[in-house]
């Protein structure tokens, strides 16, 4: 799995990318990260650790044609889909993380959807949180039309609700915002998704239930058991695959590939699934 990003850099720029699988995703058997400007390697690329094993690469370059290539092969062992405790170590405290995942954020204005959510999902407060989250995810799946180009990087959950169309991040943002409005901690995970068509970076929702983060894909375009975590955050603002920190650059092309050497799992999009 991996990707190739192409940029036209028009003035000296600094970049941050989140394209390598998270350290929690599994054992890496082979990996390549190549960053070139006009065909020559870019030096001084540093890797930094983000939340939940995210790997952030920082680098700078001058004007020219920039290409970022990343390819990773994970070991054949299952990548931890069972329901169980979250990986320990330096992860955020459960209570603090739950509080953050309940608050409105840039693309998930849950505070504006409290009344709507209460009306659309009556009785949700008394239901099991995961059952409610599945109801929300199914509602988003039925309500929205998946349409490339129907939204842009400025569109939020409320915009998506009004337009009724979007792509994976829009589905995730609306699902997250509605879950938060119903009192369920929710966050976004960017992932590689074997089986996804058309192939691209993918975004799904995670909800916190009884101390475990469970994944929901409101697009239903890929089996959750095959997803490989890249980054995790409040919304797409925390999980962007590339950010221009300084300078000026235009993204020209994105190519993503992800496959598995085994038969893809069948997903009913109801049973609980936890990402590694």
Residues covered by each model-derived region:
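Residue-level signal for pocket-adjacent positions within structured domains
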Residues: 51-54, 97, 156, 211, ...
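Secondary-structure boundary elements
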Residues: 9, 68, 74-78, 84, ...
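Glycine-rich loops and low-complexity Gly/Arg-rich segments
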Residues: 29-32, 41-43, 59-61, 93-97, ...
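Low-complexity, flexible helical/coil segments
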Residues: 39-45, 52-57, 70, 105-113, ...
